[in-house]
């Protein structure tokens, strides 16, 4: 559950969104990617964190949409944001508390749906071999610290990154250049 909880909190902490967000105002407006990227770089059309967790491994990343002329800068900003979350002192207690509260709220609201509860039971049985009660999940979330999130982010960045691009990719920085930026974590 350690990886799952850290991954979920980290995804919420990073957050993101688009320059236009359907579903009403206020969604993700306090997340790091919204505050530090979308409000500052108007050429970025969307910039969001994503994650998937499996038994003993997982996937965490950032996807972005931007015009071709801004893609090199956008990739640089994405790298900077990933490095920032792995750097002690760059994430505040307020940001972590907000991410924890948002994640807990989202999980509790989702568990009001019987379909989602059934999917969650199946996912936990397949992934962990048993189902943990919601109180266990809530306690794990509450116990996460800034040190836990920083250590988890460092662990994520210590693996070889994967990079995918589509569209007009002529101005996308080469993989080797991007990968080298994370060298200090390996």
In which residue ranges do the predicted regions lie?
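M16/insulysin-pitrilysin zinc metalloprotease superfamily fold
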Residues: 16-28, 41-44, 48-115, 184-186
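Generic hydrophobic alpha-helical scaffold/packing signal
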Residues: 10-14, 34, 38, 63, ...
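Glycine-rich, charged/polar anion/phosphate-binding loops
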Residues: 33, 45-50, 148-150
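A glycine- and charged-residue-rich anion-binding loop/surface
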Residues: 8, 48, 137
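His/Glu-rich zincin catalytic helix
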Residues: 1-36, 75, 161-186
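Generic recognition of stable, solvent-exposed alpha-helical segments in well-folded globular domains
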Residues: 4-9, 28, 32, 73, ...
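C-terminal regions of mature proteins
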Residues: 100-186
């Amino acid at each position: 559950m350690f990886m799952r909880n850290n991954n979920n909190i980290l995804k919420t902490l990073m957050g993101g969104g688009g320059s236009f967000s359907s579903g009403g105002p206020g969604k993700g407006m306090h997340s790091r990617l919204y505050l530090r990227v979308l409000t500052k770089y108007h050429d970025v059309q969307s910039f969001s964190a994503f994650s998937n967790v499996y038994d003993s491994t997982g996937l965490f990343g950032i996807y972005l949409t931007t015009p071709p002329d801004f893609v090199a800068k956008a990739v640089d900003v994405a790298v900077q944001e990933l490095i920032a979350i792995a750097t002690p002192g760059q994430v505040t207690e307020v940001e972590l508390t907000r991410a924890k509260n948002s994640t807990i709220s989202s999980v509790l609201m989702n568990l009001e749906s019987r379909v989602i509860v059934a999917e969650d039971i199946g996912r936990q049985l397949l992934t962990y071999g048993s189902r943990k009660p919601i109180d266990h999940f809530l306690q794990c979330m509450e116990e996460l610290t800034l040190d836990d999130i920083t250590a988890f982010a460092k662990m994520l960045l210590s693996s070889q990154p994967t990079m995918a691009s589509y569209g007009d990719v002529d101005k996308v920085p080469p993989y080797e250049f991007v990968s080298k930026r994370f060298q200090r974590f390996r």
